[in-house]
Protein backbone atom coordinates (compact mmCIF):
# COMPACT_ATOMS: atom_id res chain seq x y z
CA UNK A 1 0.00 0.00 0.00
CA UNK A 2 1.28 3.50 -0.88
CA UNK A 3 0.03 7.05 -0.33
CA UNK A 4 0.74 9.71 -2.97
CA UNK A 5 -1.04 12.67 -1.37
CA UNK A 6 -2.73 13.76 1.80
CA UNK A 7 -5.75 11.57 1.12
CA UNK A 8 -5.33 9.28 -1.90
CA UNK A 9 -4.06 5.73 -1.61
CA UNK A 10 -2.84 3.01 -3.98
CA UNK A 11 -2.92 -0.71 -3.19
CA UNK A 12 -1.05 -3.38 -5.15
CA UNK A 13 -0.82 -7.10 -4.52
CA UNK A 14 -1.04 -10.70 -5.61
CA UNK A 15 -4.26 -12.70 -5.75
CA UNK A 16 -5.36 -16.31 -6.09
CA UNK A 17 -8.85 -17.62 -6.76
CA UNK A 18 -10.84 -20.83 -7.00
CA UNK A 19 -14.21 -21.09 -8.71
CA UNK A 20 -16.96 -23.60 -9.34
CA UNK A 21 -19.99 -23.12 -11.61
CA UNK A 22 -23.02 -25.11 -12.77
CA UNK A 23 -25.39 -24.25 -15.62
CA UNK A 24 -28.38 -25.66 -17.50
CA UNK A 25 -29.65 -24.67 -20.94
CA UNK A 26 -32.63 -25.49 -23.16
CA UNK A 27 -33.15 -24.77 -26.85
CA UNK A 28 -36.37 -22.86 -27.58
CA UNK A 29 -36.41 -24.45 -31.07
CA UNK A 30 -35.67 -28.14 -30.41
CA UNK A 31 -36.33 -28.31 -26.64
CA UNK A 32 -33.00 -30.11 -26.27
CA UNK A 33 -31.43 -29.72 -22.84
CA UNK A 34 -27.82 -29.67 -21.73
CA UNK A 35 -25.91 -29.10 -18.52
CA UNK A 36 -22.34 -28.14 -17.68
CA UNK A 37 -19.99 -27.68 -14.78
CA UNK A 38 -16.66 -25.93 -14.39
CA UNK A 39 -13.92 -26.07 -11.77
CA UNK A 40 -11.00 -23.71 -11.99
CA UNK A 41 -8.28 -21.73 -10.29
CA UNK A 42 -6.23 -18.67 -11.12
CA UNK A 43 -3.34 -16.41 -10.09
CA UNK A 44 -2.86 -12.74 -10.79
CA UNK A 45 -1.98 -9.17 -9.86
CA UNK A 46 -4.15 -6.23 -8.85
CA UNK A 47 -3.83 -2.51 -8.25
CA UNK A 48 -6.42 -0.08 -6.87
CA UNK A 49 -6.34 3.69 -6.41
CA UNK A 50 -8.72 5.55 -4.08
CA UNK A 51 -9.09 9.33 -4.07
CA UNK A 52 -10.37 9.41 -0.50
CA UNK A 53 -10.13 5.96 1.17
CA UNK A 54 -10.85 7.23 4.68
CA UNK A 55 -14.24 8.74 3.88
CA UNK A 56 -14.93 6.27 1.01
CA UNK A 57 -15.94 9.12 -1.31
CA UNK A 58 -14.62 10.34 -4.65
CA UNK A 59 -13.05 8.53 -7.58
CA UNK A 60 -11.43 5.12 -7.75
CA UNK A 61 -9.51 3.11 -10.36
CA UNK A 62 -9.24 -0.67 -10.16
CA UNK A 63 -7.06 -2.88 -12.38
CA UNK A 64 -6.24 -6.56 -12.34
CA UNK A 65 -4.94 -9.36 -14.56
CA UNK A 66 -5.26 -13.10 -13.97
CA UNK A 67 -4.20 -16.34 -15.61
CA UNK A 68 -6.76 -19.12 -15.08
CA UNK A 69 -7.09 -22.83 -15.79
CA UNK A 70 -10.39 -24.73 -15.85
CA UNK A 71 -11.68 -28.28 -16.07
CA UNK A 72 -14.97 -28.36 -17.98
CA UNK A 73 -17.71 -30.96 -18.36
CA UNK A 74 -20.72 -30.81 -20.72
CA UNK A 75 -23.60 -33.29 -20.91
CA UNK A 76 -26.13 -33.27 -23.77
CA UNK A 77 -29.61 -34.77 -23.87
CA UNK A 78 -28.82 -37.36 -26.56
CA UNK A 79 -25.04 -37.40 -26.22
CA UNK A 80 -22.48 -38.55 -23.71
CA UNK A 81 -20.47 -36.36 -21.38
CA UNK A 82 -17.53 -34.45 -22.84
CA UNK A 83 -14.60 -33.31 -20.69
CA UNK A 84 -11.96 -30.78 -21.71
CA UNK A 85 -9.56 -28.18 -20.30
CA UNK A 86 -9.32 -24.45 -20.94
CA UNK A 87 -6.92 -21.73 -19.87
CA UNK A 88 -5.96 -18.15 -20.60
CA UNK A 89 -5.73 -14.54 -19.51
CA UNK A 90 -8.43 -12.19 -18.21
CA UNK A 91 -7.70 -8.53 -17.44
CA UNK A 92 -9.82 -5.59 -16.31
CA UNK A 93 -9.72 -1.85 -15.77
CA UNK A 94 -12.62 -0.20 -13.93
CA UNK A 95 -13.23 3.42 -12.96
CA UNK A 96 -15.98 5.08 -11.00
CA UNK A 97 -16.85 7.58 -8.33
CA UNK A 98 -18.81 7.28 -5.08
CA UNK A 99 -21.22 9.99 -3.94
CA UNK A 100 -22.86 10.09 -0.54
CA UNK A 101 -26.23 11.82 -0.71
CA UNK A 102 -27.76 11.15 2.69
CA UNK A 103 -27.56 9.56 6.12
CA UNK A 104 -30.11 8.54 8.73
CA UNK A 105 -29.55 6.81 12.09
CA UNK A 106 -26.09 5.62 11.09
CA UNK A 107 -27.16 4.28 7.68
CA UNK A 108 -25.70 6.19 4.70
CA UNK A 109 -27.03 6.33 1.12
CA UNK A 110 -24.73 6.22 -1.91
CA UNK A 111 -24.70 6.29 -5.71
CA UNK A 112 -21.73 5.04 -7.74
CA UNK A 113 -21.50 5.44 -11.56
CA UNK A 114 -19.06 2.91 -13.04
CA UNK A 115 -17.33 1.97 -16.28
CA UNK A 116 -15.28 -1.14 -17.03
CA UNK A 117 -13.32 -2.83 -19.83
CA UNK A 118 -12.60 -6.57 -19.51
CA UNK A 119 -10.27 -8.48 -21.84
CA UNK A 120 -11.36 -12.12 -21.92
CA UNK A 121 -9.13 -14.67 -23.64
CA UNK A 122 -9.68 -17.99 -21.85
CA UNK A 123 -9.57 -20.60 -24.64
CA UNK A 124 -10.38 -24.29 -24.64
CA UNK A 125 -7.81 -26.89 -25.60
CA UNK A 126 -8.67 -28.56 -28.92
CA UNK A 127 -10.25 -32.02 -28.68
CA UNK A 128 -12.37 -34.45 -30.70
CA UNK A 129 -15.95 -35.08 -29.66
CA UNK A 130 -16.44 -38.71 -28.63
CA UNK A 131 -19.81 -39.32 -30.29
CA UNK A 132 -19.14 -37.75 -33.72
CA UNK A 133 -15.38 -37.30 -33.98
CA UNK A 134 -15.90 -33.59 -34.65
CA UNK A 135 -12.83 -31.47 -33.94
CA UNK A 136 -13.74 -28.79 -31.40
CA UNK A 137 -11.30 -25.90 -31.38
CA UNK A 138 -10.87 -22.59 -29.58
CA UNK A 139 -13.20 -19.68 -30.26
CA UNK A 140 -12.28 -16.00 -30.21
CA UNK A 141 -11.21 -13.60 -27.49
CA UNK A 142 -13.63 -10.90 -26.32
CA UNK A 143 -13.48 -7.34 -25.02
CA UNK A 144 -16.44 -6.58 -22.78
CA UNK A 145 -17.50 -3.01 -22.04
CA UNK A 146 -19.78 -2.19 -19.11
CA UNK A 147 -21.37 1.15 -18.23
CA UNK A 148 -23.78 1.55 -15.37
CA UNK A 149 -24.52 2.75 -11.88
CA UNK A 150 -24.95 1.18 -8.47
CA UNK A 151 -27.09 2.52 -5.63
CA UNK A 152 -26.30 1.12 -2.19
CA UNK A 153 -26.63 1.54 1.55
CA UNK A 154 -23.81 1.27 4.10
CA UNK A 155 -25.21 -0.30 7.26
CA UNK A 156 -22.85 -0.61 10.27
CA UNK A 157 -22.93 -3.78 12.38
CA UNK A 158 -21.95 -4.64 15.95
CA UNK A 159 -19.59 -7.45 14.91
CA UNK A 160 -16.53 -5.19 14.83
CA UNK A 161 -15.76 -1.50 14.60
CA UNK A 162 -14.85 -1.76 10.91
CA UNK A 163 -17.64 -4.11 9.83
CA UNK A 164 -20.70 -3.20 7.76
CA UNK A 165 -22.92 -4.59 5.06
CA UNK A 166 -24.02 -2.94 1.82
CA UNK A 167 -27.24 -4.02 0.06
CA UNK A 168 -27.36 -2.65 -3.49
CA UNK A 169 -29.10 -2.57 -6.85
CA UNK A 170 -27.21 -1.94 -10.10
CA UNK A 171 -28.24 -1.22 -13.69
CA UNK A 172 -25.74 -1.86 -16.50
CA UNK A 173 -25.35 -1.79 -20.26
CA UNK A 174 -22.90 -4.47 -21.43
CA UNK A 175 -21.30 -4.73 -24.88
CA UNK A 176 -19.38 -7.80 -26.08
CA UNK A 177 -17.07 -7.38 -29.08
CA UNK A 178 -17.40 -11.08 -29.97
CA UNK A 179 -20.18 -13.63 -29.65
CA UNK A 180 -19.59 -16.71 -27.49
CA UNK A 181 -18.31 -19.06 -30.18
CA UNK A 182 -16.85 -22.53 -30.52
CA UNK A 183 -15.22 -23.91 -33.67
CA UNK A 184 -16.53 -27.28 -34.93
CA UNK A 185 -14.27 -28.55 -37.72
CA UNK A 186 -14.05 -25.46 -39.98
CA UNK A 187 -17.21 -23.63 -38.88
CA UNK A 188 -17.98 -21.37 -35.93
CA UNK A 189 -21.13 -21.83 -33.84
CA UNK A 190 -22.29 -19.78 -30.91
CA UNK A 191 -24.96 -17.91 -29.03
CA UNK A 192 -26.53 -14.91 -30.75
CA UNK A 193 -28.14 -11.95 -29.06
CA UNK A 194 -25.51 -11.22 -26.41
CA UNK A 195 -23.63 -8.41 -28.16
CA UNK A 196 -25.66 -5.71 -26.40
CA UNK A 197 -27.13 -6.58 -23.02
CA UNK A 198 -29.16 -4.86 -20.36
CA UNK A 199 -28.51 -6.06 -16.83
CA UNK A 200 -30.18 -5.60 -13.47
CA UNK A 201 -28.33 -6.86 -10.41
CA UNK A 202 -29.29 -7.17 -6.75
CA UNK A 203 -26.88 -8.14 -4.02
CA UNK A 204 -25.25 -7.54 -0.69
CA UNK A 205 -21.58 -7.06 0.19
CA UNK A 206 -20.38 -7.36 3.76
CA UNK A 207 -17.16 -6.23 5.40
CA UNK A 208 -16.92 -8.84 8.12
CA UNK A 209 -13.63 -7.47 9.50
CA UNK A 210 -10.91 -5.03 8.51
CA UNK A 211 -9.46 -7.47 5.97
CA UNK A 212 -12.30 -9.82 5.00
CA UNK A 213 -15.35 -9.43 2.77
CA UNK A 214 -18.34 -11.59 1.83
CA UNK A 215 -20.65 -11.12 -1.14
CA UNK A 216 -23.83 -12.47 -2.69
CA UNK A 217 -25.61 -11.29 -5.83
CA UNK A 218 -28.23 -12.22 -8.41
CA UNK A 219 -28.35 -10.69 -11.89
CA UNK A 220 -30.58 -10.96 -14.94
CA UNK A 221 -29.32 -10.09 -18.43
CA UNK A 222 -31.47 -9.44 -21.51
CA UNK A 223 -30.38 -9.21 -25.15
CA UNK A 224 -31.75 -9.54 -28.67
CA UNK A 225 -33.18 -12.71 -30.28
CA UNK A 226 -34.80 -13.69 -26.95
CA UNK A 227 -31.40 -14.02 -25.28
CA UNK A 228 -31.52 -13.99 -21.48
CA UNK A 229 -29.27 -15.17 -18.67
CA UNK A 230 -29.78 -15.50 -14.92
CA UNK A 231 -26.60 -15.50 -12.81
CA UNK A 232 -25.92 -15.93 -9.10
CA UNK A 233 -22.65 -15.53 -7.19
CA UNK A 234 -21.48 -16.08 -3.64
CA UNK A 235 -17.96 -15.39 -2.46
CA UNK A 236 -15.55 -14.51 0.32
CA UNK A 237 -12.34 -12.48 0.08
CA UNK A 238 -9.49 -12.06 2.56
CA UNK A 239 -6.71 -9.46 2.22
CA UNK A 240 -3.36 -10.36 3.78
Question: What are the language-model segments listed below?
Answer:
Residues 1-240:
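Membrane translocator/pore-forming domains, dominated by Gram-negative outer-membrane beta-barrels
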